Amino acid sequence: MEWHDEGIVLGTRRHGESSVILEAITAAHGRHLGLVRGGRSKRMQPVLQPGNRVDLTWRARLDEHLGLFQVEPLELNAARLLNSAVAIYGIQLLAAHLRLLPERDPHPGLFEALGVIAAHLDEPETAGVLVARFELAVLDALGFGLDLARCAVTGSREDLAYVSPKTGRAVTREAGAPWADKLLPLPTFLTAGNEALYDRAILSQAFALTGFFFARHVYEPRGLTEPEARAGFLAAVMRNLPEGESAP
């Protein structure tokens, strides 16, 4: 068995004296693990850092085996990301989200999204929005996607302001007004194609929204707790955002 693909490093763990087991999200083969011989060498350690884009060749006798990775660097982002608390927490959070998905289950859209985020993860004004949208995409990949395209009551695509905690569907400001205290606020930048301004309060609403559905559909049923990196990421982003509005 052999395949060739691009990947983004999620993490490694030590294996023996000189090797590591590499975990990467790939373009066509999903989240995949493999042994990298000599992965702890001075040459390979900088390559195998989280956030780096790499060229991967995987070989194994049988498909179900761990297999061996041959790794070549394509884009070394880690040195830049390690200088930012937002980026450090962010890459940990993104990796934790991807580990919720079945191993080797292809998600090319998430791979491409992660590549875009990695390029901006040390930019707090942009990173918060990108990660919030990524969380929506992960929920969708897990089968728990939210319907934010139109109002569940009226069918309107305009002035969507709330999300029903029961159905995960959007509701307009007018239709939701009588039940506003029971609905979740919907930040406008989460609706398709919307580039609305946002501030700390609005970004907090976005993460409260995605966090609610992660807890209900993923963490609680699986007996998991929210990744610690999530609170760390949000706090680091907030420290760099103004109180008023900021462009995404």
Swiss-Prot record:
Keywords: DNA damage, DNA recombination, DNA repair. It comes from the Bacteria. Disulfide bonds: none annotated. Coiled coil: none annotated. The keyword DNA damage applies. Involved in DNA repair and RecF pathway recombination. This is DNA repair protein RecO. It comes from Chelativorans sp. (strain BNC1).
